[in-house]
Amino acid sequence: MGFDQYHEPADELPQETRTFARLCASLTEEAEAIGWYEQRLAVESDGQARAIMRDAQGEEFKHFSMDLEFLLRRTPLWREIAEGILFQEGDIVEHGEESEEEATEGAAERGAPLAGSTSLGIGGLKRAAS
């Protein structure tokens, strides 16, 4: 069974990068499974079948959460951004923008490399055009 998840030759990638890619793929698969269960639950009328599917969906969410936690532990900048967004009240997008700005400014002030930054710099271009 072939699984092409790399955009660069796999044998040239360090093990840490390959593990990171595997967890990204796993996170995606878990998210898809959660969505599939949600669709099944939306159309299933049998209560016992729904209970089984709901339980299975919960397992997928647990796996999704563990994959996400692994990735956030390996990428401190992402973790800092996520902490400003997750479990917060109010506007999600606003929290996201503020959190990203604070995290990247903080990393720059600390002299930390911004490798792995989620920003493409497009927001800066939008502000410059204003």
Summary of predicted features, one role per range:
Residues 1-130:
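Iron-associated oxidoreductase/ferritin-like identity signal
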